[in-house]
A protein has these predicted regions:
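C-terminal cap/substrate-recognition subdomain and adjoining C-terminal extension
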Residues: 65-165
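Alpha-helical substrate-recognition element adjacent to the catalytic core
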Residues: 1-96
Length: 165
């Protein structure tokens, strides 16, 4: 069995920008202009070859699904699951009024018992979202921002050592 990689979306594969910008987005969802990081599709082809792949975003479902459809296209069917905000645990609210969410892997392991803390890795740019998970079950790359949106994805080095022998 392949290890499971669970990817966040915003900050990993794309950046969402609200409001006016002179830069043409790759696609738009509601008020958000979305910019996909270069090399994402090539990286995902590699990831799907070596790992089981899933998505867990803290965005609302009506935003999560269109983003996944855009990034994965017809390969969306190869995802083991797609979790959204409704699968997160809300723990409070930021001063700006935005909710604070956790991504608790115990829910993944309850639904998919063949995965556990030895073969599951959550890739998320927000370390605070995984504080209730066992150690060594998450990787936190530098977040993609509007200013760095042209920087190609570079996660293979982080993930190559996780591949089964």
């Amino acid at each position: 069995m392949k290890p499971l990689l669970i990817f966040d979306l915003n900050g990993i594969f794309l950046v969402r920008q609200r409001g006016a910008t002179s830069h043409k987005p790759d696609f738009t969802i509601g008020a958000f202009k979305c910019y996909v990081r270069p090399g994402v599709r090539r990286f995902l082809k590699w990831a799907h070859h070596h790992f089981d792949v899933a998505v867990w975003s803290s965005t609302m479902p009506h935003n999560t699904i269109p983003i996944v459809k855009y990034i994965w296209g017809k390969k969306m069917k190869d995802l083991k699951f797609i979790f959204s905000q409704r699968h997160c645990t809300q723990t409070g609210t930021m001063p700006c009024g935005k909710p604070i969410f956790l991504k608790e892997l115990k829910y993944v392991w309850e639904m998919f018992p063949w995965y556990d803390e030895t073969n599951t890795f959550l890739i998320d740019d927000s370390p605070h979202k995984v504080v209730n998970n066992p150690p060594h079950t998450s990787i936190h790359p530098e977040p993609l921002t509007f200013e760095t949106r042209h920087v190609p994805i570079d996660l293979k080095n982080h993930l190559s050592h996780l591949q089964p022998l």
